[in-house]
Swiss-Prot record:
Topology with respect to the bilayer: Single-pass membrane protein
Function text: Peptidoglycan polymerase that catalyzes glycan chain elongation from lipid-linked precursors.
Name of one Pfam family that matches: Transgly
PANTHER family in UniProt: BIOSYNTHETIC PEPTIDOGLYCAN TRANSGLYCOSYLASE, MONOFUNCTIONAL BIOSYNTHETIC PEPTIDOGLYCAN TRANSGLYCOSYLASE
Protein name: Biosynthetic peptidoglycan transglycosylase
Length: 242
């Protein structure tokens, strides 16, 4: 290898190492800070806002209103757990059984990819990472998930998730969603309304709360049944998530 190639290789390696250190400090600081402080915006919100501006849509505003868990209806937390991650109180950030099932499904159905992301993984991804599918992003997501599972309580993870989840075009967080679709604060959401919001996850740009399709209504009904089977509100109290 020539001296010039060695120099370039050495430069690239040093740059990547420094970048990794900077990102580790940035993400580690974010995990520590947001363990107690409200989250003002997420990476997904920034991505959506920048994309809108680049497409000339200057009326788009990614909007979120932070609320604490005691300002969120317990039905809402239960609904997203029933819909997205029923083992949330028990696992350490990853649902291994669901991952194995998803991998087996995806091998058989290449055109219908099934995910197995837990609420913890979705929180890490939405808060810190870009959208899309790649092994690099998945690796970073895994590391960040371990970080928030180590530093945050399950209640904190659920609180952040509910405050940054996307529920529609420019609608981020359960408070903004409750006000937009039901004209009430998140604390007043009913069981049925919470299930409807959860029914559009994790694809709220395709499925609409304001104009629910037959699929969304069917999923809402399924979520309501799962909420009942989990035990209703006592489930949240039992696992100290309310």
């Amino acid at each position: 290898m020539s001296k010039s190639r060695l120099t370039v290789f050495s430069f690239v390696r040093r740059f990547l190492l420094r970048l990794m250190v900077v990102l580790a400090i940035f993400w580690g600081g974010g995990i520590a800070l947001f363990s107690v402080a409200p989250v003002p915006f997420s990476a997904v919100m920034v991505e959506r806002q920048v994309s809108a501006w680049l497409h000339g849509n200057f009326r788009y505003v990614a909007h979120s209103d932070w609320v604490s868990m005691d300002q969120i209806s317990p039905w809402m937390g239960l609904a997203v757990i029933a819909a997205e991650d029923q083992k949330f109180p028990e696992h350490w950030g990853f649902d291994v059984a669901s991952i194995e099932q998803a991998l087996a499904h995806n091998e058989r159905n290449e055109n219908r990819i099934r995910g197995a992301s837990t609420i913890s993984q979705q929180t890490a991804k939405n808060l810190f990472l870009w959208d899309g599918r790649s092994w690099v992003r998945k690796g970073l997501e895994a590391g960040l998930t371990l970080g928030i599972e180590t530093v945050w309580s399950k209640k904190r993870i659920l609180t952040v998730y509910l405050n940054i989840a996307e529920f529609g075009d420019g609608v981020f967080g359960v408070e903004a969603a409750a006000q937009r679709y039901f004209h009430k604060p998140a604390s007043k959401l009913t069981r049925s309304q919470a299930a409807l919001l959860a029914a559009v996850l994790p694809n709220p740009l395709r499925f609409k709360v304001s104009a629910p399709s037959g699929y969304v209504r069917s999923r809402q009904a399924w979520i309501l049944r799962q909420m009942y089977q989990l035990g209703g509100e006592p489930f949240m109290q039992q696992h100290q998530l309310d």
